[in-house]
């Protein structure tokens, strides 16, 4: 393998000082076999150990244009699998809320937020400013401030480039599995597959704390009550067992909500930390806008 990117080589050398040493070609079949085994072991170690360490710096080095194009590809593939809700009034209400939050950030990057028809109570950010919100989350929310809190949290993940960092980390591990088991298929690399990877990403405690802080900061600057995120987290905190979304159709909204909580575990300390940051006092949407958003998937539009 030949690598010419000097910044990547520098990062690789920092993570694995011995990975870039020059080796002489093997002189016998036995030597070749041993060398091949060492190479495979080194590759496995690099991807399981080196990629996680390199995920953050590699994500920071990725050009914004590349990230946006990548996110668009994943988003388009995901849309083909899960139909979008196209209610015009609801879409306008969501766009208004999104823009109100986006202008609080200095990045100026646009956000594209879409609601998808699914009972799953979840939302997640894709690279490049794309955010997927499931119908089930809007149905489970008891106020527009709860939706605003979740939306601000996911937008904060994107501002900090957490989805891209998570994909660099996760796909490094999957690449090893594909190689060892017989090849990394095109299907595994498809946008739809990557969308599923993002959907199941579980961020670290530090990453979630960062998204909480930035998300509440957005709510404060937009003068939106931040208690919505707290209410959303605490309403089902007493549930003992967290259930993931892929276990089938849920029997209740409470069970469906566990999908979101499984990737965003609240915890009493985390909720207290969020509460200490809340400063906003205003409404997220008008009563008319909230009604429109609640029925965004009910309207018959082309």
Residue ranges and their predicted role:
Residues 4-9, 13-302:
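A Zn2+-metalloprotease active-site environment signal
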């Amino acid at each position: 393998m030949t690598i010419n990117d000097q910044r990547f080589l520098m990062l690789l050398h920092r993570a694995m000082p011995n990975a870039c040493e020059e080796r002489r070609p093997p002189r016998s079949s036995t030597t070749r076999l041993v060398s091949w085994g060492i190479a495979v072991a080194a590759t496995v170690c690099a991807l399981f150990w080196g990629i996680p360490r390199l995920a953050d710096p590699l994500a920071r080095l990725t050009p914004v244009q590349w990230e946006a194009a990548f996110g668009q590809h994943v988003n388009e593939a995901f849309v083909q699998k899960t139909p979008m809700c196209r209610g015009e009034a609801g879409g306008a209400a969501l766009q208004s809320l999104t823009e109100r939050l986006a202008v609080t950030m200095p990045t100026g990057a646009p956000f594209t937020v879409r609601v998808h028809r699914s009972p799953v109570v979840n939302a997640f950010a894709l690279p490049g400013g794309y955010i997927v919100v499931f119908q089930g989350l809007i149905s489970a929310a008891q106020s527009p401030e709860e939706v605003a809190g979740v939306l601000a949290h996911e937008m904060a993940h994107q501002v900090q480039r957490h989805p891209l960092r998570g994909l660099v980390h996760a796909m490094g591990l999957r690449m090893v599995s594909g190689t060892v088991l017989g090849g990394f298929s095109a299907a595994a690399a498809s946008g739809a597959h990557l969308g599923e990877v993002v959907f199941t990403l579980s961020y670290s405690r530090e990453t979630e704390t960062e998204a909480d802080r930035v998300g509440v900061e957005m709510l404060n600057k937009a003068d939106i009550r931040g208690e919505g995120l707290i209410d959303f987290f605490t309403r089902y905190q007493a549930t003992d067992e967290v259930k993931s979304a892929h276990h089938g159709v849920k029997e209740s909204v409470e069970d469906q909500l566990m999908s979101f909580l499984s990737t965003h575990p609240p915890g009493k300390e985390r909720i207290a930390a969020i509460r200490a940051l809340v400063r906003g006092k205003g409404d997220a949407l008008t009563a008319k806008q909230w009604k429109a958003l609640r029925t965004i998937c009910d309207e018959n539009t082309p």
